[in-house]
């Protein structure tokens, strides 16, 4: 997937409400800014490789069957190409260009209550070295309270646990306890 100049390779699920998945999460900042979204349906092939493969005689095979066989496109990829690539070019080189950068229209991101992870939060400039709010002593922030583009999955959990430990140790010191005593 590509949005603006950012490229992300990963999986996505096509559902009734749109696309979601690890391949898209990294592109969220660019998509929020209105960047167009494209998908490379054959990321392991060059545009020339694709053009050469589809330029072979197809006999009585339909275009979709020809593309399925020559490029190993699955039903979802073929459906996206048919829906978002219309009208499909007849020339192999032009069709290869569409396959390498198929533009996927979207109307925006899903609502906040459906989010897996969100951007925004307390800016790091508002915190001290122990993740305590500079304007509200004794209030510590960690995990998704912080303003950062958090990755999803195990990385997010690891970062939340790490910042929780960081803030917790700082809170213990703030209360006059030695966090070394509890390890």
Per-range role (PLM):
Residues 145:
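Active-site metal-binding loops of divalent metal-dependent hydrolases
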Residues 164-172:
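N-terminal Rossmann-like FAD-binding beta1-loop-alpha1 element of flavoenzymes
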Residues 2-142, 151-153, 158, 172-177:
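Residue-level recognition of phosphate/Mg2+-coordinating polar/acidic sites
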């Amino acid at each position: 997937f590509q949005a603006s100049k950012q490229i992300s390779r990963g999986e996505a699920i096509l559902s009734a409400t749109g696309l979601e998945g690890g391949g898209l999460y990294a592109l969220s900042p660019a998509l929020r800014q209105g960047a167009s979204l494209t998908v490379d349906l054959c990321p392991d092939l060059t545009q020339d490789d694709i053009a050469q493969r589809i330029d072979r005689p197809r006999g009585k095979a339909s275009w979709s069957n020809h593309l399925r066989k020559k490029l190993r496109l699955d039903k979802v990829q073929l459906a996206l190409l048919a829906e978002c690539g219309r009208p499909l070019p007849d020339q192999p080189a032009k069709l290869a260009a569409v396959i390498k950068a198929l533009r996927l229209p979207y109307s925006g991101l899903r609502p906040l209550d459906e989010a897996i992870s969100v951007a925004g939060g307390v800016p790091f400039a508002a915190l001290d070295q122990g993740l305590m709010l500079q304007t509200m002593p004794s209030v510590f922030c960690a995990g998704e309270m912080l303003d950062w583009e958090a990755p999803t999955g195990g990385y997010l959990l690891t970062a939340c646990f790490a910042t929780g430990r960081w803030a917790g140790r700082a809170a213990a010191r703030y209360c006059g306890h030695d966090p070394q005593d509890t390890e």
